[in-house]
């Protein structure tokens, strides 16, 4: 059974309202970033890594429960390498390794061996943070170039505006959730991976709509551009909602049952996909409408403003 077939919802009729609404959301996101700065993870602010192994089978859930007794905020635990090998990251460069070692000694006595202890200085963490920002920026530029070549340059600009909107709004919501204590979300490599995934997902959603717009420009040449865009959104609505709903369903399961390791990434994806679906319909498409109708009307009345060919 297929849903949302042959719909005729006026998505573009209230585009000015959604433009203002989205602008307000972006302003709020920027203000939150300034006054509620994010908590950087060990990857970006420095810390210590302790790698160790057990000579018996140990559940990572039990190990995490024991390590939490050290009361180290921002502690990260994951398995690596062979069986019963684990890696702990702590933000406390000097005292963190000793706290972890003491807890392991109390809980497991001589049943573990320390493989290595590495320290990540603040300078290295800062360099990694800058590289992560460059990764996000280059991803946006690559997406714009791809869409510009596949469609037109204006479509690439519309996609970039939507992506920037997605990142700012998603980031703002995450800051609120973190500072309210609902989830402990840090800006680390997993966070950046989540943002990049959101960027790719948002662009994919936008490309589907843009592709239908291009098809309908050939099929409905006499139709007003705004109505043609609205038709394209309605025609792709079923695919958009079904894809978003199924993805969100999986993410909800990961948020509640994926454990601390996957919870943050899944939540970022959850928020980002909802925001990205919204921006594909109400941001990217509306910019293309503005460029092809309202902007051209203004230039027609004021030829001196035609600085963009």
Give names to the regions the model predicted.
Residues 1-309:
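A structural signal for conserved, well-ordered secondary-structure elements
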């Amino acid at each position: 059974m297929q849903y949302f077939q042959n719909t005729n919802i006026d998505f573009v009729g209230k585009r000015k309202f959604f433009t203002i609404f989205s602008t307000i959301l972006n302003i709020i996101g920027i203000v939150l970033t300034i006054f509620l700065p994010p908590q950087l993870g060990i990857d970006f602010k420095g810390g210590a890594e302790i790698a160790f192994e057990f000579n018996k089978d140990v559940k990572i859930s039990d190990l995490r429960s024991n390590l939490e007794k050290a009361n180290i905020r921002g502690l990260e635990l994951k398995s690596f390498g062979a069986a019963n090998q684990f890696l702990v990251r702590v933000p406390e460069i000097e005292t963190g390794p000793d706290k972890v070692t003491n807890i392991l000694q109390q809980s497991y006595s001589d049943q573990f061996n320390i493989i290595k202890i590495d320290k990540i200085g603040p300078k290295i963490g800062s360099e990694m943070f800058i590289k992560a920002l460059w990764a996000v920026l280059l991803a946006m530029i690559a997406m714009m170039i791809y869409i510009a070549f596949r469609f037109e340059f204006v479509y690439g600009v519309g996609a970039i505006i939507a992506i920037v909107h997605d990142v700012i709004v998603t980031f703002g919501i995450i800051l609120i959730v973190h500072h309210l204590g609902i989830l402990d979300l840090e800006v680390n490599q997993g966070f950046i991976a989540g943002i990049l995934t959101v960027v790719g997902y948002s662009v994919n959603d936008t490309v589907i709509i843009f592709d239908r717009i291009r098809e309908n420009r050939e099929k409905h040449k006499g139709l007003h551009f705004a109505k043609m865009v609205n038709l394209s959104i309605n025609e792709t609505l079923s695919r958009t909602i079904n894809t978003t709903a199924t993805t969100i369903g999986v993410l909800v399961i990961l948020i509640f049952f994926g454990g601390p390791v996957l919870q943050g990434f899944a939540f970022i994806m959850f928020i980002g996909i909802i925001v990205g679906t919204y921006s594909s319909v109400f941001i990217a498409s509306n910019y293309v409408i503005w460029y092809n109708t309202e902007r051209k009307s203004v230039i027609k009345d004021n030829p001196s403003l035609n600085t963009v060919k």
